[in-house]
Regions:
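Alpha/beta catalytic barrel-like cores
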Residues: 1-142, 149, 158-160, 166, ...
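Acidic/histidine-rich catalytic cores of soluble enzymes
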Residues: 185-296
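Short glycine-centered, acidic/aromatic-flanked micro-motifs in structured strand/loop junctions
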Residues: 88, 178-180, 219, 252
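Surface-exposed amphipathic alpha-helices with a cationic face
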Residues: 75, 162, 200-204
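A structural/positional concept
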Residues: 153-155
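Aromatic- and glycine-enriched pocket-lining scaffold segments that form the walls
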Residues: 165-166, 171-185
């Protein structure tokens, strides 16, 4: 089937071998928190910050060893290059608070990531599920002691990220997201943002190595309990990032449902050297459903591929579903992202761009529709074969569920 597909794509000037080779070189940063419903390992408080997991599927990882085992199994069923995306709340054996975290609290993660052949580790300060989230505020808090705690936490995370970069000889992306906002109409929208700006200034002034660490800031339109006002808005962060030469991270669940991250990516590529993504699937709101191979995901992948931005755009996944097998959630979402990238790589973007520039929109529409029915599935299966994987990952996951996950309950 693959040879027939190869010939069919060749009629359109598309090299399937080149597409497969390119796909194998695009790393995806896979989030650890799907495995334990964002619980973390540092004994933090119940989930807060407008974040919610729903469901009670058996087998949730309850400790570091179980989470490692689940990640190892799930990652073994995923094709392509992989990185691990960690939240700071996954510190191992830390007997200090989050503002005092050090590289040693993540040394076991480094050891594990190397053992399973990962390309690197990305990192996130954890500014939720903690007693120092006071009145829903962290880096924008009017309480200077609270604000200093979270500034120190972020600075600690930057130094931990330098450690990751040294260990893997690969830059570490550090994404700063805060839950700060108000449930109802605020009396002052400016001052909290000025406090956030001052906090970020202090964090960036800590002397971290910009060659090793890429700092990103992530906006959100609203969250549960912060429906009326979000301090870290899109406009605030895009201006701050541009002025301070850092990176914007786009989470496609963090915007109005009629806003599309696929349209935002090329807008930022016109000005930024690096754009970061948290790919999720929002259903009516930022519900963080498992990523599926659907239209907007394809459009996101197209903007990465056709703009030659596979090295500029840092792809990470961010979703958590506790209603289904968590390993299946991991593998399905990562596979969907890879499928979307391959689908875009199997497209003659130069031809389509030429039709657009000639204003031949009739031919453009026809060609775009033709691509949808080309034998993509045969190329995907060949890619999996070369990665020594099968399309049927569910059988392996069911076996692991029976032998390992059900024993946890």
């Amino acid at each position: 089937m693959y040879e027939l597909a190869k010939k069919e794509y060749g009629k359109y000037g598309i090299d399937t071998e080149a597409a497969i080779a390119s796909l194998r070189d695009i790393p995806i940063s896979i989030h650890c928190w799907q495995g334990d419903d964002v619980t973390g390992l540092d004994g933090g408080e119940s989930l807060s910050g407008g974040i919610q997991t729903t469901g009670n599927y058996p087998g949730r990882a309850r400790n570091f060893e179980e989470l490692k085992a689940d990640i190892k199994k799930a990652f073994s069923l995923m094709p392509g290059k992989k990185r691990l995306n960690l939240h700071a709340s996954y510190a191992v054996g830390a007997e200090v608070d989050r503002d005092k975290y050090e590289p040693k609290h993540f040394a076991e993660w480094v050891k594990f990531a190397k053992e399973i052949g990962l390309q690197g580790i990305d990192f996130n300060p954890t500014m939720f599920s903690h007693k120092n989230v006071k009145d829903g505020l962290t880096l924008s808090s009017p309480d200077e002691n609270i604000r200093k705690f979270w500034i120190d936490h972020c600075i600690a995370c930057l130094h931990i990220a330098e450690y990751f970069a040294d260990e893997f000889k690969s830059p570490c992306l550090v994404n700063i997201w805060i839950p700060d906002g108000f449930k109802d109409v605020p009396a002052d929208r400016l001052t909290p943002r000025l406090r956030l700006k001052d906090s970020l200034d202090k964090i960036l002034a800590c002397g971290y190595d910009r060659k090793k660490v890429t700092v990103a800031v992530e906006s959100k339109v609203f969250g549960i309990g912060v429906e009326s006002y979000t301090v870290g808005s899109n406009e605030f962060y895009q201006n701050y990032a541009a002025k301070n030469n850092i990176c914007c991270l786009l989470d496609n669940g963090h915007y109005h449902p009629l806003e599309y991250v696929s349209d935002k990516i090329p807008a930022l590529l016109a000005f930024y050297d690096t754009v970061a993504l948290h790919v999720t699937r929002g259903v009516r709101w930022d519900s963080d459903h498992v990523v599926l191979f659907e239209d907007e995901l394809k459009e996101i992948a197209k903007e990465i591929v056709r703009n030659n931005a596979t090295e500029k755009v840092k792809i990470g996944l961010d979703y958590f579903d506790a209603s289904i097998n968590r390993l299946s959630a991991w593998v399905t979402g990562q596979g969907a992202m890879q499928k979307a990238l391959l689908f875009s790589l199997l497209c003659n973007h130069a031809e389509l761009r030429s039709l657009q520039d000639m204003s031949d929109f009739t031919a453009l529409m026809v060609k775009q529709e033709e691509y949808k029915t080309l034998p993509f599935g045969a190329v995907w299966k060949e890619y999996l074969r070369r990665e020594n994987l099968s399309e049927d990952y569910l059988t392996e996951i069911r076996k692991y569920e029976k032998e390992v996950l059900k024993e946890r309950n």
